[in-house]
Every structure is written in C-alpha cells, then in structure tokens.
Amino acid sequence: MSRLVVVSNRIAPPDEHAASAGGLAVGILGALKAAGGLWFGWSGETGNEDQPLKKVKKGNITWASFNLSEQDLDEYYNKFSNAVLWPAFHYRLDLVQFQRPAWDGYLRVNALLADKLLPLLQDDDIIWIHDYHLLPFAHELRKRGVNNRIGFFLHIPFPTPEIFNALPTYDTLLEQLCEYDLLGFQTENDRLAFLDCLSNLTRVTTRSAKSHTACGKAFRTEVYPIGIEPKEIAKQAAGPLPPKLAQLKAELKNVQNIFSVERLDYSKGLPERFLAYEALLEKYPQHHGKIRYTQIAPTSRGDVQAYQDIRHQLENEAGRINGKYGQLGWTPLYYLNQHFDRKLLMKIFRYSDVGLVTPLRDGMNLVAKEYVAAQDPANPGVLVLSQFAGAANELTSALIVNPYDRDEVAAALDRALTMSLAERISRHAEMLDVIVKNDINHWQECFISDLKQIVPRSAESQQRDKVATFPKLA
C-alpha cells in the first residue's frame, strides 16, 4: 500500500489533539492515519536551515519539520506568500507589494524544501501539497526526477485572469502548476478561473470534462469543497457552559444575539459588516435594546500595515456606532480583538440567534459550517452568509447576501431576527444534511481516491515533456 506524504507550510504539532486542531489538520491527520505516511513542513521557528530535520513518529505517522532562516521566512512567507499571493488571490491588487527579491526567495525556499524532502521519498509514495505557499513545489520535485503522483489543493480562491495576469510572474506560476497530476479547488468558479488563466497563456487541450494537457503536461482539475467534523462540533457546543458564559447567557436571555468570529483580515469584510449593522439599527429601530452584535476578530499579521489599518478602522467604527445608538443599559455592538478557545466559540455559536458570516472573498469559510453544526436542531439560529464565500455554493438554505450591499445585509438580519421557528428548523436541517454528507473525511477521501487513480509519470514521459512547448497566444 502506498504511503501518503503531505506537504504544507506549517504542520500541526504531533501532540496536538485533533479536536483542538484546525480543519486542515483534522483532514490531514485522518488521511495519514488511514494510509500511514509523512507530514512534512516548516517548524514555525527560525534558525539554521542546515540542521537535520526534526522527526517525530507516532503510530504509522511521521512528522518531519525544518527551520527557516530569517531572510527566507521574510521573503518566502511575509513578502511573497502573504504580501503578493494572498491579496491577489482575494482580489485585492491594490494591496499587492511585488518585489523581485521576494519572488526569488519564494522560489528558493520551494527548491530548498524539495531538497529536504527528496531523501525521505519512496518510489510509490503519493504526495499531497497544500496551498499557495507551495505553488512551485511539484515543479521542483520534477526537476529532481520525482515521478510520483503529486496532487495540490488550493484552500483560498483562484482569481480570474484580469486579476491573476497582473502578477509579474503569473506565466511562470501557471506553468509550474501544470506539473501537478491533480489540482483541487474549493469551488467550480475557482477551477474555471484557473483554466481561464491558463488558456490566456497557452493552448489547453481538454480530453474529458476535467482532464487537460497544457505546457506539455497532462493533469486533472477537480472541485473538493473542504468540510468540518460536525459530530465533534455538536458535542463541543452541547457541553456544559463555563460559569462566566452561563452567567452571560442568563443576563442576555431577553436579548437576541448576532455573532461573528474570524481573524482580523481585510478579506473578511468587517468594516462593511459594521456598516450593515448600523443600517439595521437605523432602518429597523424596533430592535433597539433587544439585540446585541458581538464581533470577535483576533489580530493576525499585526506587523502588516493593512492589518493595522483595518484594526484601527474597526475600533473607530465600533465606538462611533455605540456612541450613536447606545442607551443606558444597552451597548449594541461588542468588538473583541482577542483570541478565544475553539471549544468555547462552539458554545457561543449555539446560543447565538444569528451567525453573521460575510467575507468579501473566501475560499470556503469553515466558520459558516461550524455555526450550523453547533446549533440546537430543535431551536437553531439563522446563518447570514456572503455570496462570495465558497460555502455559499453548499449552504443554499442560509440567507445569502452581497456583503457590499449594507441595506441587503441589514434586511437579511431583520429577517433572521424575526424568522419563525418552523422556517429556522427547516433551513438548518437542509444545511446540516449537506455538512454531514460532505464532512472533512469525505473531502480527504475523495481527493486521495482521485489521486490514486492517476497513472504515475514515467521517466520517459518526463523527458518528452521537457521538449514540448507551446507559444503564448496573442
């Protein structure tokens, strides 16, 4: 039986309990436990890159991690992955800060990781690469003679040609992506956007619906919407409340709660969300004193100016809205710029009447799915969801909104707050059914199954591919 080798920018610590891990970690651990194998990635620490890999083995899984130098971390991670790819893939070209040394560092680190992984590989290993930090990784492995089946899954959106082609190195990135045998995306829109970008660069031959040839390489594209662990989340949500949360729930028993949580990021649409809530207070005054909106947004990438700007903007907006609409004994908006334990959040989800998830652009958004899974089926809350979240393709029984339209979001919030119990139960049941069917294990099993069906590349085909070129289209 072939081993599974997973490569991601970061690896979850071997001693981290699956229930406290994020969605990616849960899916990867499930796949690795089923097949046995290796999880390879950055340790999260800076230091001497020449040090031997740190290896930890538990059961049939080996964790192998490495350090990065300060320069490599800065160029590969901060200045290219997060200052170029992240904003561009989330349709924010205005925030892209392309620097040639950062691009060189991005390629250099991907080559370095390929060098470190190469001695660990076996001939029949199946290799699964994750996310935008590692777009060139298959290219680097192929250069080193690796003919194994290599799959790639992109967790964030893939932009349309008008956005992607603005990147100075777009053509190189597209050619490198063709070195994968299987390219997985969150949504059909992302898959088609990739093919549109590639078609603008070179000729793409499609042999069947999702099997293609471009740049002399044969590969498949497919959609794999990532899921969650609904049973585990329901268990966490239904458990006893900590004393402080139980007291808060009692104090708010006559108040309807609107709740949001995500890390502080410009892609999440937080300023637009605050303005939509203000529109609710302005246009539907009957809710004054009877609702409370809580936004939890822990700082991420706090050293980046764009993130500092959005934090200050939210602080100002929260103060302004509370000053304008607040009353003695009633604060309409609570904004908390701090981290909360994941299990505690599931309990807060459960007693919230409305889950407000309105990113401007998101690959999937697991918070939306977690909110649904955490609800009491007999008395569920209502999900208000952005049409630009990947989850909107599956959770069609949510109240789907355009996050740029504050009046539409306000109207959806009013509808959610006044929705009948029968409608809430019906909508929740439909969404929960989808979430249970397409859970995290279904996601990884589908991807691995499809990757296994691909015939490995031969040394002869690799050599033949080296001389196959296609001109750019005018």
Curated annotation (Swiss-Prot):
Disulfide bonds: none annotated. It catalyses: D-glucose 6-phosphate + UDP-alpha-D-glucose = alpha,alpha-trehalose 6-phosphate + UDP + H(+). Pathway: Glycan biosynthesis; trehalose biosynthesis. InterPro entries: Glyco_trans_20, Trehalose_OtsA. The record marks W86, I156 as: Involved in alpha anomer selectivity. Pfam families: Glyco_transf_20 (PF00982). Homotetramer. Belongs to the glycosyltransferase 20 family. PANTHER family: BCDNA.GH08860, TREHALOSE-6-PHOSPHATE SYNTHASE. This is Trehalose-6-phosphate synthase.
